[in-house]
Each structure stands twice: as C-alpha cells, then as structure tokens.
C-alpha cells in the first residue's frame, strides 16, 4: 500500500513538473516575443526620431555645407603639409639615429675583434715558447742521461784522478753553457712579447684615429642640425609675431567674434530641435513603460505564488530520498547484526570444544591459558568498540534529526517569505494602478536627486540574512507604524527575525486601506518629503506624485493618499534613525546571536 501511494505521488509529481516545464516554456516564448516586439517598437521610434530630426535640421545644414567643406579642405591641406614636414623630419632623425647606432655597434665589434686578435696572438706566442722550452728540456735531459751513463762506465773502468777532475770541469762548463742558452732563450721570448705588444699598440692607435675622425663627423652633423633648428625657430618666431598682430587687429577680431556667435547660435538651435523631438518620444515611451511595468508586476506576483507551491514538491522529493536512504541503512545494519550473531555462535561453539578435552591435556595448560587471556582481551576491546560505535550512531541519528527539524523550519520560512513577496508585488501593482488612475495630466518639473532601479525578486534562493532584508522591505510596503518597525529593526537572533516576518505578513496586511488620518498643513508635508528624499532615497516618480497630491488637495481621495504618504515617511524617518543608532551601537555583530543555536548551524550534512 505504501509503495502504491509513493508511486502515485511520484506520478503526480512528474505530471506537475511536466506541466510546470510546459508553462515555463510558454512563458519564455511569450517573453521572447514581447522582447522582439519591444525591440521593433524601439527601432521604429528611433527611426521616426532620426527622420524628424533630419528633416528639421536640413535647412541649417545645407547652408553651411559649402563653407564647412572649404574650411575642411584648407585645414586638411595644412594638416597634410604639416604631416609631410613632420614625417620628413622624423625620417631624417631616424636615419641619423640609425647611422649613429650602426657606427657605435661597428666600433664596438671592431674593438672586440682587435681584443680577440691580441689575445689570440699572445696565446700562440706563449704556446710556441712553451713548446720550445719543452724541447730544450728534453734535449738537456737526454744529454745529462748520456753523461751519467758515460761517467758510470768510466768509473767502472777505474780512471785516474786527473781524468776525473777534467771530466768534472767539463760537466760544469756544459751546465754553464746550458744556463746561458736558457737566458738567451728567455730574452728572445721577452723580445717577441714586446714586439707583439708594440703591434697591438699600433693597432689601438689606428683605431683611436678612426674614432676621432668619426667623432669629428658627428660633431659636424650636430652643428648642421643645430643650424637647421635655429632657422626653424626663427620661422616659428615670425609666424608667432604675425599671429599676435592679427589678434591685435580690430577688424579680424570683430569678424572672428561674429563667426563664433553665429556658430554657437546654429549649434544651440540644432540642440533645441533635437531635444524637443526626444522629449516628445520619451514622454510617449514613459507612458508605455509604465503600463508594461504594471503588467510585469502582476505576472511576477502570479509566478511567485507558483514558485511557492513548487517548493513543497521539492521538499517532498527530498524527504522521499532521505526516507529511502534511511531504509537502506536500516537493512544494512540488520545484515550486520545477523553476521555478528553467526560469528558469536561460532565463537561459543569453539570455546565449548576445548573445555571437553581439558582433562586429557593438563600438562600443556600454559599455552592455552595464554591464548585464553589474549582472546579475553580481544573480546573486551570488541565490546568497547561496539559501545563507541553505538554512541556514534546515536549521535549521527540525533544530528540528522536536528538537521531535519532545521530544514522544516527553513522551508516554512521560505514559504512565508514567498507569500509575503507575492503579496508585496500585488500591493505594489495596486499602488501603481492608483497612481496612474489619480495622477493629473499636468507635468511638474522635479529635480532628480537619486536614480535607483527597482529590482524585482524573481530568483528566490535566499539565505537568512536576505530574509532580514526582505522583512525590512516588507515593512516599507505594508505601511507599518513606527513602534512596530522598531521591534522589527532590532532583533536579537534569527528566530526573532523569522517570527516577526510571519507576524508582519499575518497581522499588518490590512493596513494598506486608505483610512482618514490627522490633517497636516501643506508646508509641513513638503518639508517632511524633502527630508525623506534625502534619507531614504525615494524615486523621482513618487516625489512628483507627492508634490502633485500636495498641490491638488481638493478631492478627498488625493488628500487621504497624501496624508498616508506623509505618515509613512515619518515612520521611515524614525525607522532609519533607529537603524543608524543600532548600527552604531552593535556594528561588528549585526543580526547574529552570541549563542550557537541550531538555526545558525549548517542545515545540510
């Protein structure tokens, strides 16, 4: 039975969702068609405006086209000549800069090449000298080895002492000869190094001479450029003197002033014509937009009611999903309980078997006692973990139950908010109808103080802070007295905000009816209206309506309406003052209670 009921409810829910989707599609199509028609109408209006402006301004443009074209041609020719001269000067400067940069780069590269050549020559010379020294050392080594060999042979042959002395002198002379040869070689190496240094210095002298010539050429080019600049400066000075003389000439001055006045007059006439045409078109567009806004407000109120009913279906789906999840968890837990019971039975059967055979195995009791102690410890740990697991499950169930309660409260508050917003839109639509009905045709020029767009609350995924703000907006629409607005502006917790919102919806809705109030003078009303505009930022349409109602107090309905507006504005003044005082007193913790209540926690886990 329960499954059949659930299936029927799901079928009904699917049908309702399909109908809602179809209605949304039709609504989107209607909105798109309406937008297309609005765009076409705007295009036609703009085309009419442009046509009228063009026809009315042709008589002024045709007279001045020839003069403008001639002036433009003269100015363009002057600009072309000036641009040509500037381009020529720029090209010359670029050529000079490129030549200078090229010369500098070439000089740098030449200096680098010369340095590399010098280093290469020095490396080659050092390599050559080292090779020569190595060869010389090899020859000396071979000679010395030969002499040692000969000496050893002669010593073995037992020479006389005289021959040995002569041989020793000969070896000394040969060593002196080798030292002298080494000194000669070192001097030759030094001479070669000095010759290489002299050649490098000669190359540097040549390079410095070339740089000197290039610098002289650059100095000459700089001097020529300076002479050209002096000539250009003289020409500009002559032109400046001519311009000053023309400015001091009374004839040219009078003509220029008359031309400026004529140009300004023509421009002002064109602006006047275009502003008249735009004023007429914008006046018609304003009337049409008011009618469209009235229709849109009524449609939005109906859509808000439909969306309020939609939230109930979403809550049903969520609750059904949670119910299925909990049923699955219960089945899983039952299966675990059965498995644990089976394991317990097996464990008891295993314990009973060794108790039967205990009489035969009295000698091997040590190991059995040890295993028994381990099993007891494991059983105690299992029982403790089971207790902790049950505690955690109870905590999880408690948290889920609390989350469900919070979700229920949240859905109830959202439902209440949607109802209040739909009623708010209906009341706004009624107020606009009354304004359009009783508004006089005479237009009064009102200085625009503040421009604010009216945001229509279509998307209703609001948090608790937005609920507080919407309750404040609802207080403005429902025309609450000052004492009750004090109670709504200074809440202590989020629950108080929600309760006050429900009370304001249920109790203070019939206060909108136009009832007679205390008679106030017109001057006091105008003063209060000005103060209210500065504080609250009332739109220009409401201000114009209040001024018109203050000027035309002959009919009783308009008088009652103006009195109602003045009293509402007094209430707004007091509410705004109280809000400022509360914000000054408790600035860092606005609308948040100090205790951690269940409503302040996250409702979804």
Curated annotation (Swiss-Prot):
GO terms for molecular function: kinetochore binding. The keyword Nucleus applies. One of its GO terms (cellular component) is spindle pole. Residues 3-442 form a coiled coil. Residues 564-581 have a biased composition (Basic and acidic residues). Required for the localization of dynein and dynactin to the mitotic kintochore. Dynein is believed to control the initial lateral interaction between the kinetochore and spindle microtubules and to facilitate the subsequent formation of end-on kinetochore-microtubule attachments mediated by the NDC80 complex. Also required for correct spindle orientation. Does not appear to be required for the removal of spindle assembly checkpoint (SAC) proteins from the kinetochore upon bipolar spindle attachment. Interacts with KNTC1 and ZW10. These interactions appear weak and may be transient or indirect. Interacts with dynein intermediate chain and dynactin (DCTN1). Interacts with the catalytically active form of USP45. This is Protein Spindly. It comes from Macaca fascicularis. The gene is SPDL1.
């Amino acid at each position: 039975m329960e499954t059949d009921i659930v299936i029927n409810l799901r079928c009904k829910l699917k049908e309702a969702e399909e109908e809602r989707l179809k209605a949304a599609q039709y609504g989107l199509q209607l909105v798109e068609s309406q937008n297309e028609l609005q765009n076409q109408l705007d295009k036609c209006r703009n085309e009419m405006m442009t046509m009228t402006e063009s026809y009315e301004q042709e008589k002024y443009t045709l007279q001045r086209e020839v003069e403008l074209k001639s002036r433009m041609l003269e100015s363009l020719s002057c600009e072309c000549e000036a641009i040509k001269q500037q381009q020529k000067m720029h090209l010359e400067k670029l050529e000079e800069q490129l030549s200078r940069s090229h010369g500098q780069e070439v000089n740098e590269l030449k200096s680098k090449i010369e340095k590399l050549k010098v280093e290469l020559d020095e490396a080659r010379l050092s390599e050559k000298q080292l090779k020569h020294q190595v060869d010389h050392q090899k020859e000396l080594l071979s000679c010395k080895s030969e002499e040692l060999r000969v000496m050893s042979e002669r010593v073995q042959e037992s020479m006389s002492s005289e021959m040995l002395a002569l041989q020793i002198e000969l070896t000394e002379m040969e060593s002196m000869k080798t030292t002298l040869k080494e000194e000669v070689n070192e001097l030759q190496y030094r001479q070669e190094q000095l010759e290489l240094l002299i050649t490098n210095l000669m190359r540097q002298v040549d390079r410095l001479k070339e740089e000197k010539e290039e610098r002289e050429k650059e100095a000459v080019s700089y001097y020529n450029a300076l002479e050209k600049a002096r000539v250009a400066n003289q020409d500009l000075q002559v032109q400046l003197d001519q311009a000053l003389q023309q400015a001091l000439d009374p004839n040219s001055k009078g003509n220029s002033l008359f031309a400026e006045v004529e140009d300004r007059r023509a421009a002002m006439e064109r602006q006047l014509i275009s502003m008249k045409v735009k004023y007429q078109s914008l006046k018609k567009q304003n009337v049409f937009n008011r009618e469209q806004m009235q229709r849109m407000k009524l449609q939005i109120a109906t859509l808000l009611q439909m969306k309020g009913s939609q939230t109930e279906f979403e809550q049903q789906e969520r609750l059904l999903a949670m119910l299925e999840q909990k049923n699955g968890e219960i089945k899983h837990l039952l299966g675990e309980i059965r498995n644990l019971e089976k394991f317990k039975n097996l464990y008891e059967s295993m314990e009973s078997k060794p108790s039967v055979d205990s009489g035969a195995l009295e000698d091997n009791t040590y190991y059995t006692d040890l295993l028994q102690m381990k099993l007891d410890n494991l059983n105690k740990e299992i029982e403790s973990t089971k207790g902790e697991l049950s505690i955690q499950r109870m905590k999880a169930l408690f948290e889920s139950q609390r989350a469900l309660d919070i979700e229920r409260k949240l859905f109830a508050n959202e439902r209440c908010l949607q109802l209040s917003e739909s009623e708010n839109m209906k009341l706004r639509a009624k107020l606009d109808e009354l304004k359009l009905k009783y508004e006089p045709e005479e237009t009064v020029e009102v200085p625009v103080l503040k421009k604010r767009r009216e945001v229509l609350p279509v998307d209703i995924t609001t948090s608790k802070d937005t609920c507080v703000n919407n309750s404040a907006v609802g207080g403005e629409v429902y025309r609450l007295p000052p004492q009750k607005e004090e109670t709504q502006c200074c809440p202590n917790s989020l629950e108080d905000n929600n309760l006050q919102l429900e009370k304001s919806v249920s109790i203070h809705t019939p206060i909108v009816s136009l009832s007679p109030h205390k008679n106030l003078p017109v001057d006091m009303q105008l003063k209060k209206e000005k103060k209210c505009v500065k504080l609250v930022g009332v739109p220009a349409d409401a201000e114009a309506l209040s001024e018109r109602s203050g000027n035309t107090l002959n009919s009783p309905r308009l008088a009652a309406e103006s009195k109602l507006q003045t009293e509402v504005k007094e209430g707004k003044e007091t509410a705004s003052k109280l809000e400022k005082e509360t914000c000054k007193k408790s600035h860092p913790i606005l609308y948040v209670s100090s205790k951690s209540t269940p409503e302040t926690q996250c409702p979804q886990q």
